[in-house]
């Protein structure tokens, strides 16, 4: 069963999706990570919510530059309060 998105999650993922469809194709492939930063942002927002997801996405985007080696960098799993 699919989890429903909050209106803020929907808005954030729609903006990122718009970037993927309209802006990213004109710039060409530049991201050195897998998944790409925009896919990472959508996944982080869906998994962790808007605030924490945007925090993870912002940290990831700051690492996406020519001096960073890149590579595999999946979204961290959601930790529950009982996990330490």
UniProtKB/Swiss-Prot annotation:
Keywords: Cell inner membrane, Cell membrane, Membrane. Could be involved in insertion of integral membrane proteins into the membrane. This is Putative membrane protein insertion efficiency factor. It holds the Pfam family YidD. The lineage of its organism: Bacteria, Pseudomonadati, Pseudomonadota, Gammaproteobacteria, Alteromonadales. One of its GO terms (cellular component) is plasma membrane. Its main location: membrane. It is a peripheral membrane protein. SMART domains: Haemolytic. PANTHER family: MEMBRANE PROTEIN INSERTION EFFICIENCY FACTOR-RELATED. Belongs to the UPF0161 family. It comes from the Bacteria. The keyword Manganese does not apply. It is found in: Cell inner membrane.
